[in-house]
Curated annotation (Swiss-Prot):
Keywords of this entry: Chloroplast, mRNA processing, mRNA splicing, Plastid, Repeat, Ribonucleoprotein, RNA-binding, Transit peptide
Top-rank taxon, per record: Eukaryota
Organism: Zea mays (Maize)
Region entry CRS2 binding, spans: 554-576
Residue span of the annotated presequence: 1-54
Disordered, as annotated region: 31-61
One family name in Pfam for this protein: CRS1_YhbY
Protein name stated in the entry: CRS2-associated factor 1, chloroplastic
SMART domains recorded: CRS1_YhbY (SM01103)
Length: 674
């Protein structure tokens, strides 16, 4: 009897166990299946010998240093605004973008320089499309002064040249920009031109590249049929709208007549002719941007590495002043950054959602326009520092204490004397203000003191003795005298107090004399009386001679009338000492005043035409008569439902001489016609 073998367990590791190896031929067959070729074998083209198609050129671009001659190739020039192209007979040097070129000289080039205007001007092989053949049919050149017939079919509408003023003739042979523009436009003409293009969908869009070279021809294409070209700017180019308007007028030759946000209205000129326009060659491809200096340095000038690191850490904790939207209008961004620098030395702008290149272009523009120093572009934010040599753009405060203190620079004994005189006058003014706020003064005593004030020991002096006050308050250094009338200005209230008739030599000490001083000092003019006196004075303009006692007499008269009529309440010193009594009397006095305004002398409207009836009344009477003559309506109540139902009584006979308008039915109208 055969017994089964017991399974033996191996104590070797899997790497030490021996496995049978297959032959090499079998291994190849299992791992790699041999498949016949499906198609003919493709042959590679022979590699060209031109450097433009080499592997190095197709890979990572090498930095080509710029020669010292400033002309790397024929017609190509490296300037402080990038790379420019110069052609014979051109009015200016061409650039790919006239507004978005960085204001820095390139450090190196990324490709060999060439002229991007076509095969004739390009030293490299032509890689673009084959140019279209010229048309055999010679089309007449478009002339703006020779318009097509108005009823001709298949012709787009064309605006005529102009507008021309009365007596003005068009200039056909206009060459210069001033001759093409003609006379300046009036406000009515500008509003009419803008209104005609405001809702037009035919516009030129300007994006992150700004005003490019090929847009010049597009603007002339718009001017071919319309007087105004509407340009809509969005994105990075809107930061410096003034530069865009300047470049448009300089390169194209028109006139910006209106600008609102990112929309520009460019007028072609009164004598513009499309046939005599300047023709520019088109750029057939975009040149590669050169290498510019780094925008952000690790350690900005004037800082240590630790200070720069601490400033970046502190700047990332600041809230951003604004968030820029994609394809938005950033015309106010420069002013916002400048205002923010008035409050803090670091400013952060949120650029989340924008392209990385747009964020860096915005930072480069702010660096030149604000100006400022860029610290970081991390976390899609622009972090800026105002710099160590920053100066505030706000004007200094003229009324501040520091400015006044700087202006008051005196020397020697003269300064001490001036300060003494000014101190005396200021003490008098403080005494006047304290006396005016004194509550306890009697009406009879005030009248007596006013009558006797001319005989008191207060001798009035001119303002010649106190010139220091005029110097310290910033008033003109001309010293007024008592003979010259004082000029009053609401912006300079010190002139009211410093009347030549109000300056005192001695300061009274008792209470009665202080009240007299108060009454005498209240002769300051108010705006209404001064205006009335200016109108009466025909000899002088802007000067007013102050009267002494007219205003105080009128004030006392009004106060006396108020007391007699019960509209004013006078309390004695004993009554003022008790606060409860003052409260009770004030409450009782408040309740005694009528709640509504009482007008004693009210004007009554006199009816000049009493016998003539009013037109409105006649119209209303006529409407009432028509309503009475209309068909009556009876309200019948349903007992079950309880709701009212309106029914018309048709059994009533109509009057034969009354014709109702819009109230007859068909059967009733037939009865009347029969």
């Amino acid at each position: 009897m055969a017994t089964a073998r017991l399974p033996s367990r191996s104590f070797l590791s899997p790497a030490q166990q021996s496995y049978p190896r297959l032959p090499a031929s079998v291994r190849l067959c299992l791992s790699h299946h041999e498949q016949p070729p499906t198609g003919p074998k493709r042959h590679r083209r022979a590699a060209t010998s031109h450097p433009a198609f080499s592997a190095a050129a197709r890979g990572r671009a090498k930095k080509i240093p710029i020669a010292d001659t400033d002309e790397p190739a024929a017609g190509v020039r490296v300037t402080d605004r990038g790379i420019s192209y110069r052609l014979d007979g051109a009015p200016f040097e061409f650039q790919y973008s006239y507004t978005e070129a960085p204001r820095a000289r390139p450090v190196a080039l990324r490709e060999a320089p060439f002229m991007p205007f076509g095969p004739e001007a390009t030293p490299r092989p032509w890689t673009g499309r084959k140019p279209l053949p010229k048309s055999r049919k010679e089309l007449p050149e478009f002339d703006s002064f020779v318009l097509p017939a108005p009823g001709k079919k298949g012709v787009k509408p064309v605006q005529s040249p102009g507008p021309f003023l009365a007596g003005m003739e068009p200039r056909y042979q206009s060459v210069s920009r001033e001759d093409i523009l003609g006379e300046p436009l009036t406000k009515e003409e500008v509003s009419e031109l803008v209104k005609g293009s405001l809702k037009s969908k035919r516009q030129l869009n300007m994006g992150r590249d700004g005003l490019t070279h090929n847009m010049l021809e597009n603007i002339h294409s718009h001017w071919k049929r319309k007087r105004v070209c509407k340009i809509k700017c969005k994105g990075v180019c809107t930061i410096d709208m003034d530069n865009i308007c300047h470049q448009l007028e300089e390169k194209v030759g028109g006139k910006v007549i209106h600008r609102q946000g990112g929309v520009i209205f460019l007028f072609r000129g009164r004598n513009y002719n499309y046939r005599t326009r300047p023709c520019f060659p088109l750029m057939l491809w975009k040149p590669v941007a050169p290498v510019y200096p780094r925008l952000v340095t690790k350690v900005p000038g004037g800082l240590t590495p630790d200070e720069a690191t601490e400033m970046r850490t502190r700047g990332h904790q600041l809230p951003p002043i604004c968030k820029l939207g994609k394809n938005g209008v950033y015309a106010n961004l420069v002013n916002q950054v400048r205002e923010a620098f008035e409050a803090c030395d670091l400013v952060r702008v949120d650029c989340s959602g924008l392209n990385k290149s747009d964020c860096r272009k915005i930072g480069a523009k702010l660096k030149d326009l604000v100006p400022c120093i860029l610290l970081s572009f991390e976390f899609e934010h622009i972090l800026m520092w105002r710099g160590s040599d920053w100066k505030s753009s706000l004007p200094p405060l003229e009324n501040s204490y520091e400015v006044t203190k700087v202006q008051e620079s005196f020397s020697g004994k003269e300064s001490n004397e001036k300060v003494t005189h000014s101190g005396n006058v200021l003490a008098q003014i403080e005494l006047v203000s304290a006396a005016t706020s004194h509550k306890n003064w009697n009406l009879d005593e005030g009248q007596e003191k006013f009558k006797d004030s001319t005989d008191s020991d207060m001798v009035l002096n001119s303002a010649k003795d106190v010139p220091a006050l005029f110097h310290s308050t910033g008033i003109s250094r001309t010293e007024p005298s008592a003979d010259i009338p004082l000029e009053y200005s609401p912006l300079n209230p010190v002139c009211d107090i410093m009347d030549p008739s109000l300056n005192c030599r001695s300061i009274p000490t008792n209470n009665c004399e202080s009240r007299a001083l108060v009454e005498k000092s209240e002769h300051c003019p108010d705006d209404y009386n001064l205006e009335m006196k200016r109108k009466r004075n025909d000899g002088t303009k802007g000067t007013v001679v102050l009267n002494s006692g007219s205003k105080v007499e009128g004030l006392l008269c009004l106060l006396e009338q108020a007391i007699h009529s019960g509209r004013a309440l006078v309390l004695s010193e004993d009554e003022l000492a008790d606060s409860d009594l003052v409260y009770e009397k004030s409450v009782a006095f408040t309740k005694s005043i009528p709640r509504r305004l009482v007008f004693e002398n009210t004007r009554r409207k006199s009816s000049a035409r009493r016998n003539v009836p009013d037109n409105h009344a006649r119209t209303k009477t006529h409407l009432v008569e028509n309503k009475m003559l209309s068909s009556p309506v009876e309200n019948k109540f349903i007992v079950n439902g309880g709701s009212a139902m309106q029914t018309i009584d048709h059994g009533q006979e109509f009057l034969s001489d009354v014709v109702h308008q819009g109230t007859l039915r068909v059967d009733e109208l037939a009865k009347l016609l029969a």
